[in-house]
């Protein structure tokens, strides 16, 4: 369909282990500064993994009154903050500046993979020690996943689609991709889209540790997340949120919005293989579907922001999937994992990493993949090891994969 509507990125918001604003996070990322350290949120001494990528220096009252914040789990705080940043960055009209028609053309789709796990743990503890009367009437709306989108919609008066996708570690990316399709198909003109997560809690850490998915490099947390390194031993939990404002191109141009990049393609593909173990076919299908949707050849891509979790199986699997999808061109790609600095934000990963991919395209630079000390011979692509690289990026690709064999890929084009 030659007349399909174009989708562009006009706003960015970020709360992450490397910074609680877009500017701070991007600066630290380019400098190769890790946001991973020993856990301070609770006593993790009894766990095999005692470190994570925690958000630092974040004050929720910069974004909402404390009374409101007390009725939300932390993942909603992060998602709201990133959404507010993105809406402000885009200069979107809201409140009294909207009429009924324009309000209906703006929607919200910010998801989370797990939701309010810390609040669920806390409420369970209070129930056991103090009884049923201590369960807060705000417990359910404070912990369910769609409430980021709900709160953003209420705050700004956006009356278009208001929903949240939940697809494990592909959540944020799927929200962005599906939001873009809503614009492309003419359902809306603007979507606030991304992902958020806050699962650095005893059950969150303990569950992944029990599955032996986490690094146990407790003596050196900052070097623990080492995608594609020979000695990688698991991923590192992270937390935060990343949100994009997506907008129909003519709509953005008409109101004089700045344009960071174009969202040119979105693809998905299932492994249909195993609950948690990776498989090359699903990621390959996802990448090829995104390229088809963007109507570009793989040879036009210069930069790929990978899922790159630092797990022994996952990194090798993604490398092989990239080779299958891109053929000989895979060796010419710059493949980067920002998880080396942020850890893995699970449902928030696609949000913050899409922000980073857009910025890489906008500024024509690849962030480094830090902690590649001895590159795994089985992972033999160019991973932009340890130093940022100025480079031409006309087309960038973003991958995320999740438990259940769910995969997603976005294609961004330079504006």
Predicted regions and their residues:
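Active-site-adjacent elements of ketosynthase-type condensing enzymes
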Residues: 44-54, 116-119, 198-225, 268-285, ...
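Active-site-proximal alpha-helical scaffold in enzymes
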Residues: 79-93, 145-148, 153-156, 161-197, ...
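Condensing-enzyme catalytic core mediating Claisen C-C bond formation in acyl metabolism
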Residues: 6-10, 37, 219-294, 303
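Short pre-catalytic strand/loop immediately N-terminal to key active-site residues, enriched for Gly-Thr
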Residues: 135-140, 160-167, 229-233, 333-344, ...
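Flexible, low-complexity linker/loop segments at domain and module junctions
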Residues: 1-9, 96-103, 294-300, 331, ...
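Conserved beta-ketoacyl condensing-enzyme motif
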Residues: 2, 9, 25, 30-167, ...
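Glycine-/small-residue-rich "gating" segment that lines the acyl/pantetheine channel
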Residues: 129-136, 177, 181, 185, ...
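Phosphate/pyrophosphate-binding loops at sites that engage ATP/ADP/AMP, CoA/4′-phosphopantetheine
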Residues: 86-102, 252-259, 287-303, 325-329
């Amino acid at each position: 369909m030659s007349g399909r509507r174009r989708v562009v990125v006009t706003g960015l918001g970020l709360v992450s282990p490397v910074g609680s604003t877009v500017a701070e996070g991007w600066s630290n990322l380019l400098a190769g500064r890790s946001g991973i350290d020993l856990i301070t949120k609770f006593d993790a001494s009894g766990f095999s993994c005692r470190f994570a990528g925690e958000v630092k220096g974040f004050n929720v009252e910069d974004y909402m009154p404390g009374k409101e914040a007390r009725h939300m789990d932390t993942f909603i705080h992060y998602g709201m903050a990133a959404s507010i940043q993105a809406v402000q960055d885009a200069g979107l009209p809201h409140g009294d500046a909207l009429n009924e028609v324009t309000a209906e053309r703006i929607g919200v789709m910010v998801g989370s993979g797990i939701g309010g796990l810390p609040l669920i743990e806390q409420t369970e503890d209070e129930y056991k020690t103090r009884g049923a009367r201590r369960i807060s009437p705000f417990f359910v709306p404070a912990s369910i996943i769609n409430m980021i989108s709900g709160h953003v919609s209420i705050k700004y008066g956006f009356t278009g689609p208001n929903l949240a996708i939940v697809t494990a570690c592909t959540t944020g990316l799927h929200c962005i991709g599906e939001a873009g399709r809503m614009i492309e198909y003419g359902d809306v003109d603007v979507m606030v889209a991304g992902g958020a997560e806050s699962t650095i809690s005893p059950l969150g850490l303990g569950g992944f540790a029990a599955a032996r998915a986490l690094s146990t490099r407790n003596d050196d947390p900052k070097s623990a997340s080492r995608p594609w390194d020979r000695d990688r031993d698991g991923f590192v939990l992270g937390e935060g949120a990343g949100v994009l404002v997506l907008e129909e191109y003519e709509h953005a141009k008409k109101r004089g919005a700045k344009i960071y990049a174009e969202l040119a393609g979105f693809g998905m593909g299932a492994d249909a293989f195993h609950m948690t173990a990776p498989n090359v076919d699903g990621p390959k299908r996802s990448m090829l579907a995104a390229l088809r949707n963007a109507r570009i050849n793989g040879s036009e891509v210069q930069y790929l922001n990978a899922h790159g979790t630092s797990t022994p199986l996952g990194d090798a699997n993604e490398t092989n999937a990239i080779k299958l999808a891109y053929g000989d061109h895979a060796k010419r790609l710059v493949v980067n994992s920002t998880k080396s600095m942020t850890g893995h934000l699970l449902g928030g990963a696609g949000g913050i990493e899409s922000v980073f991919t857009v910025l890489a395209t906008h500024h024509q630079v690849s962030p480094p993949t830090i902690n590649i000390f001895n590159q795994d011979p089985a992972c033999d692509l160019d991973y932009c090891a340890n130093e940022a690289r100025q480079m031409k990026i006309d087309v960038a690709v973003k991958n995320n994969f999740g438990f259940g064999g769910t995969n997603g890929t976005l294609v961004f084009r330079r504006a």
